[in-house]
Amino acid sequence: MGSGIWVLGFFLAAVGFAVFWNSLPAPFTFDDDHAIVINEQIRHLSTSLSPTEQGSPLAGRPVVSLTFAINYALGELNVRGYRLVNIAIHVINALVLFAIAARILRVRGVAKAPELAFAIALIWMVHPLVTEPVDYVSQRTELMMATFFLATVYFGASAAARHRSDGGTRPTVSVICCALGMACKETMVVAPIIVLLYDRTFSFGSFREAVRRRGSYYAALCATWLVLVVLLWSSPRGDSAGFMGASVSPWTYLLDQSVMIVRYLRLAFWPRGLVLDYGEPAHVTFGDVAPYILAVSALLAGTIVALVRNGSVGFLGAWFFLTLAPTSSIMPISTEVGAERRMYLPLMAIVALVLAPVARAFMARTSTVAFALVAGLLSIATFQRNAEYRSGLTLWQTVLDRWPPHARAHRNLAAELKLANRRDEEIEHLRAAVNDLPELRNALGLELLALGRNAEAADELRIYVRDHPRDADAWSNLGNALDALGSRDAALDAFKRAVAVNPDNGLSQRNLALQYLQVNDFDNAVGHAREGVRLTPGDPEAHNLLGLALIGQQNVDEAIAEFQASLRLRPANNDAAGYLERTLKATRR
């Protein structure tokens, strides 16, 4: 029996690495930039555990931050290293699930418990619905939380099976894992409840007996909630976490979740049409989603009834709803109506609920063939989903193809199209996004300006500065668009507004100086060019502009000094060399 379990475990790990191996070349995506690529905090191990800035993807998640710092120390931004760690963590989670399932099935007296537990772990591990936490690198938060969640349950259950109530090392390890999980993701908050339900269902038969036997252990597990409280206080998750800064009420968000839960269940049984980003919650009413609410309510009621009867079905139903609750109702990302990564732990319960009775209903050989077929089909689907992450362009196109289009998907696809130099298509998607994300209108204006569509650019930028009159850069962009149209006076007014809004913006000062230079107002040109040099002394172009303005004032000596200063800053590829040569020739020096 012992050697057989080791063989199954080795095979499980081998399949896991094989199925996800094609994800290794995929680039970083979406929030990976903020969590990893531009995150200075993970550049050193010593700073990785420090509190992060509010709103960071790693805020309140120092253990995950530490693993990213280790990745960076070993390979800097080589994405393969980060992805390999994610795959390894996922495989470890499958192995721990295998161990937990085998223990439960043995307690229930199920024949061939290791084989059925292996099937449960295998089907879950290769299911396409778990690809997001593995392939989306910064969602290592989900993976690591699940690792410590499962370890908390495993060591707690193991101690109970060995009749160790509050002593021994296993309960201690369980509590340590629980604390570490709290430092990975907020979903860990339900782990103490799951452990208590496990003991009541599989070890002691009642809550009273469980508390009598292991009361101090449960108290220690609950004490780890303090870790989460401290982390949330020291590194707030930002306005998008919870409902403090949400654009929808908790009630509306809860209504939306009924639709999403039904979709999650559909994806569990038919995992086609996976979506990376479902967009923001819809403003729905009870009547809009009544059928979904009835379906979810029926499942919840069935779970409660099964729990009262103290059965395995009740425990698995509770596992599903409790592990889904923190990110779907209690502490959600309120700007996301749904996320497939939320199903990472809940899917385990669904797989177990389906496979256990199916295995008992059919002969062993028939079940084995069926499991192999299902696992093979799911592995192929997962392999295909991994491939979609290898291109940001493909990934964001799938979002628009498979779900009602939303602004965030249009914005991100536009960014990928820009990288691919498909600028006209980029413009189309930016236009589709600006109504819901009006802050993109400035970017739209800039892209139109870059394409020479100056009138359209000016129109978009006028709307933007009307709504954002304190944005100095936008006023400068509008000035550039108007200047390109030949509207010099209007452009001058726009540049003046930019400087008035932010006189400490060196680029705004230089833009205004250049505009004055073009209309031969050399005194004003010199004044603003000097401000540009003062604010950006290390920019050779600032010195060049001041030099040209000084030439207009006939201040040749100072102009020569500015051109020379520019050349010292950038000896090569600098227009200052030509300016200096012409000035010296003109003055016969």
Language-model segment annotations:
Residues 408-415, 439-450, 472-484, 507-517, ...:
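Conserved alpha-helical positions within TPR/SEL1-like repeat arrays
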Residues 548, 552, 558-564, 568, ...:
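Alpha-helical, heptad-rich or low-complexity scaffold/stalk segments
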Residues 388-394, 419-432, 436-439, 450-463, ...:
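Structural signature of tandem alpha-helical TPR/SEL1-like repeats
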Residues 1-450, 473, 477, 511:
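Polytopic membrane enzymes that build or remodel cell-surface glycoconjugates and lipids
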Residues 402, 433-436, 467, 501, ...:
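Structural marker of alpha-solenoid helical repeat scaffolds
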